[in-house]
């Protein structure tokens, strides 16, 4: 961001920080981090949750910034495919073997749909989006 989050560079944080701009996100977000970076990402995760954005968070223990362990890379690729199929196509890939994953995602979807219906209701006034 070009410097610390105060002084002359504060505006960069206000403009580009994912956490400080979470209210602008309306699409489901899949977050995948290694154990060393996961703590730094929690602020963004919590901000998305606060604004009712469907978000799921996975941590790959003992891995690097770029998923290096083959089993983690495979899991990440599969999870990303599942995520896109679920949110974009409405499909569940082998739901019996991934019941926890899909149960969680269905709950996220139901919460998002409930939030959308409240925001669009006549009593809510103008659309918030």
List PLM regions with ranges:
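Active-site-proximal cap/loop segments of hydrolase catalytic domains
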Residues: 1-129
């Amino acid at each position: 961001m070009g410097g610390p989050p105060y002084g002359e560079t504060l505006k960069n944080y206000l403009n580009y920080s994912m956490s400080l701009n979470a209210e602008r996100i309306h699409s489901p977000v899949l977050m995948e981090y290694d154990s060393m970076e996961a703590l730094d990402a929690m602020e963004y995760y919590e901000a998305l949750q606060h604004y009712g954005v469907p978000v799921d968070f996975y941590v790959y223990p003992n891995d690097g910034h770029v998923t290096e362990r083959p089993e983690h890379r495979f899991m990440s690729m599969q999870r990303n495919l599942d995520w896109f199929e679920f949110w974009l196509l409405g499909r569940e890939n082998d739901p019996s073997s991934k019941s926890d994953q899909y149960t969680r995602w269905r709950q996220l979807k139901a919460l998002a749909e409930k939030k959308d219906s409240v925001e669009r209701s006549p009593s809510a006034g103008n659309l918030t989006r």
